[in-house]
Amino acid sequence: MANNTKTNPKGLDVVIQNMQNLLYNKLTTLWSIELNGYGRCYPSFNQEQNRKEIEFYSGANEYKDVLYAEENKFFFTAENEIERVGNSQFKTKVELFFIVNVSEIYPNITHRADEEVRVDVINILEQSSFATIGSIVIDIDKVFSKYEYIGTDDLQPYHCFKIVLDTLDYNINNQFCN
C-alpha cells in the first residue's frame, strides 16, 4: 500500500497533497493497517460499464478506478467552483472519501467501529491548517451520489464516508517540491 502523491503539485493540488500526507502519515501509524492514499482523483465516464467513475491518474496516460479496488483507501475530488478571493488567492470545496475495513482498524472492538474511525479522521483534519470541515456524509446513497455505483455497500466490516472540506485561501502559484 502506498501514499500516491503527485510530483511537484501546484495551487489547489498543494493543499490537497498536504492534507493527504498528514492523513496518510497519522492514520497508518494510528491504525497500523495497510492504507492507500490518493490525491485529487477525477470523474470519468466508463463507456463499457455505462457509468461515471472516480479515477486516479497513475501516469503515462493511465488511470486507476479507485472505488472498486479491494483495499483500505482515501481519496479527494475537487469538482466544485473555485472562488477568487484576491490576487492569486482562491478557495473551493474539496470532497474527501474513505473506504475502509473497520474490523482491520479496530479488531478488538466488538461493535461496528465506524464512529471511532470517523473520529480519528476528524481529529487529524482539525489539526490541519489547510481546510475546515464543512460536513460529514455517512448515508451510502449520498456518499457517492454523483456517481453511478451499483453494489457499493456500507455493511460490516466496510465503511464508506465522505467529508466535505472548505479549503482555506490558497495561492495558485504555491508549489510543493518532492
What is the meaning of each model-derived region?
Residues E34-G39, R112-L168:
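Acidic-leaning, charged glycine-interspersed low-complexity segments
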Residues G86-E104, Q156-N171:
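Oligomerization/assembly interface segments of phage tail-like spikes and tubes
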Residues T5, K10, I172-N178:
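Viral structural modules
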Residues N87-S88, P107-N108, F176-C177:
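Short conserved micro-motifs at the rims of enzyme active sites and ligand-binding pockets
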Residues N50, N87-S88, S135, L155:
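Intrinsic-disorder/low-complexity loop/linker signature
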Residues M1-G86:
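Small/polar-rich, solvent-exposed N-terminal microdomains that initiate assembly or binding
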Residues N4-T5, I105-E115:
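Short, flexible/disordered intra-domain loops and linkers
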Residues M19, L23, L96, V121, ...:
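Hydrophobic beta-strand residues in large extracellular and virion-surface proteins
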